[in-house]
From Swiss-Prot:
EC category name: oxidoreductase
GO molecular function: copper ion binding; L-ascorbate oxidase activity
Gene3D superfamilies reported in the protein's UniProt record: Cupredoxins - blue copper proteins
Annotated protein name in UniProt: L-ascorbate oxidase
Superkingdom classification of source: Eukaryota
UniProt domain Plastocyanin-like: residue ranges: 30-145, 154-318, 423-545
Induction record: Repressed progressively during incompatible Turnip mosaic virus (TuMV) infection (strain UK1). When the plant is infected by a compatible TuMV strain (UK1 m2), the down-regulation is transient and last two days.
Positions contributing to Cu cation 3 binding: 126, 469, 526
Gene label: AAO
Cofactor binding mode and count: Binds 4 Cu cations per monomer.
Sites where the protein binds Cu cation 2: 82, 124, 528
Amino acid sequence: MAVIVWWLLTVVVVAFHSASAAVVESTWEVEYKYWWPDCKEGIVMAINGQFPGPTIDAVAGDTVIIHVVNKLSTEGVVIHWHGIRQKGTPWADGAAGVTQCPINPGETFTYKFIVDKAGTHFYHGHYGMQRSSGLYGMLIVRSPKERLIYDGEFNLLLSDWWHQSIHAQELALSSRPMRWIGEPQSLLINGRGQFNCSQAAYFNKGGEKDVCTFKENDQCAPQTLRVEPNRVYRLRIASTTALASLNLAVQGHQLVVVEADGNYVAPFTVNDIDVYSGETYSVLLKTNALPSKKYWISVGVRGREPKTPQALTVINYVDATESRPSHPPPVTPIWNDTDRSKSFSKKIFAAKGYPKPPEKSHDQLILLNTQNLYEDYTKWSINNVSLSVPVTPYLGSIRYGLKSAYDLKSPAKKLIMDNYDIMKPPPNPNTTKGSGIYNFAFGIVVDVILQNANVLKGVISEIHPWHIHGHDFWVLGYGEGKFKPGIDEKTFNLKNPPLRNTVVLYPFGWTAIRFVTDNPGVWFFHCHIEPHLHMGMGVVFVEGVDRIGKMEIPDEALGCGLTRKWLMNRGRP
């Protein structure tokens, strides 16, 4: 099994920062590679021949410079730095069609930005469904004065994996009628899973030991994390899944949740943790179990009927005498027990000393999430508009006043839902497509109510983890059924709501968030499930338009569509 030694990682980090001072710089070549993520050969999108991509390790205040070389033969690429607010550098956010053009094959684009706040983050492709192809890695920003006390740490990057290519998946989702891509074949921890092995890569369903086909040095073999007894370890967890909602447990150990999406939270103890796509956590694990044993870290599916085996990693005490854990891994909680999931979400509060939200908001959006049809194509819509991101990036269109590049009519801020039954399929299944924006003045307080509803057929409402670019927001609360304006606001938590950049919208319910428009730019706000975003489930926020018009934006970020023509006519190359 692959072994990670925490103290070695720490030495590397210290040496890196000693040599690099306040600049973390690297050149990344993105290309397809043959790989065995789940013991079955497939094609991954690798960085410098590595899958998952290299970990960025920086200190708050550092400048990160990444030169991305596109070595893909026939497609563009961008990279989004998930959780980094990009204050003053919206062009470096890495959202194709929103903040930049795709990097063409053979070309290089340089991302340069400051990591202004410590936390556990990650990066991933944000063009088409490239995240699902393995274009992702961890991004750790350390605090010069860490408030947590622990002896070592490990990164756990969680993902899901299909044997079908992303191009086939995109075609299936865009077909008429839509062809659903199905559940992932495997779950991965740090790029490793076991598709052709029995449960736990060691046990069959009856609990009897079984033999797997992989060897100890295979790319799919479970990693081993070596620990010493009676120590405290920080597990940095990030979910970059394309579809799956997950649950993580460590056999024989409890977890203390201390960080969520790069923000400290009031510590609380759990036996396992739900992790939705786009979320990150830090948990503290005390190694107080029998040191002669080995223990499983297991990751299973939540929120969808599980048809995918667990992903596994091994906790190995240095004095352990076992060759492998002698017991089956923890059983993932029942997939459709949403009350259990909601109970976990409602335990998350801001740590002491964190800023409280403003008492009142200046504006409110109520975003109704529905599944609809557009000319018989299945789409996801927000307030009856399925987002169609234009070829010309919004940031360039707004910076240079190119008003023909996107729809000037903004989507509805609220739909009249008095007679809309969220518990049933939509009475009118048809929707529209659009590229309009929500335009906010600089420095105002905005509330967003995410409202879930039934899908096109049956009695089903899906989980949607929503992620915002360029911001953190306060999670004010969750509710059942249809949001009641003027009434449900009274239930908002204004005392100690957590700051997040990703929040879950539960089936047949609503979620309320609040943020301040203090970061001039164009920011994506979307469901973090790849198929849902591909099918139109997102909106675009623009704030501080007058300030965007004064920004110095690199021409290379905007060299496509109408901005390309505008820049050429200005006499620039």
